[in-house]
A protein has these predicted regions:
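Internal mixed beta-strand/loop scaffold within catalytic domains of large alpha/beta enzymes
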Residues: 1-2
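Conserved nucleotide- and phosphate/pyrophosphate-binding catalytic cores
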Residues: 5-11, 15-166
């Protein structure tokens, strides 16, 4: 899977596979991601401005910002693809089962960080309280709090679970 920007080099890469006698993969070229305002393609050169707003396009930053991997996958899958017009919450297993290349939208899609917050909240509420407690522990430790009482952390997680977005 490579964005449509790679279409001009597709014949070259196809010939390389042919020359080496390798089996051709299924080549998929979805549309590019646009900046949140919909004006121009999203670029790593836009990273500094995004970080000032508390956002990022780099996977390594999402974890530090409190986003669950499940939420990031759900969000990213729905940029330029949809299963139907009703379903938006997907586990990884759901996506493996339901994803189809035929439902990719060829039009460029703007990155919507509010949707990422929304999906993160949905996935946080889908966790067990014990799982959430373990996932928030590092954030408390990083903030300088010593967590010596697992039951208290569990109680805090239970209260926070309905309010957290990220």
């Amino acid at each position: 899977i490579r964005t449509s920007e790679w279409l001009p080099t597709f014949p070259l890469h196809g010939h390389i596979y042919y020359a080496f006698g390798w089996e051709q993969p299924v080549w998929i070229h979805p549309s590019i991601f646009l900046k949140p305002d919909g004006k121009g393609k999203m670029s790593k050169r836009d990273t500094d401005a995004l970080l000032e707003e508390g956002k990022s396009i780099f996977l390594g930053d999402f974890d530090k910002m409190g986003y669950l991997p499940e939420a990031v996958i759900n969000w990213a899958a729905l940029i330029g693809w949809s299963y139907d017009d009703k379903t938006e919450f997907f586990t990884l297993e759901d996506l493996v089962e339901k994803f189809s290349v035929e439902k990719l939208n060829p039009s460029p899609a703007a990155i919507n960080f509010s949707k990422l917050d929304h999906f993160n909240g949905l996935h946080i509420r889908a966790l067990s309280v014990d799982d959430l407690a373990e996932r928030i522990r590092p954030f408390f430790v990083q903030a300088g709090y010593q967590i010596n009482d697992d039951e208290k952390l569990r109680q805090v997680a239970e209260v926070l679970q309905i309010r957290l977005g990220n």
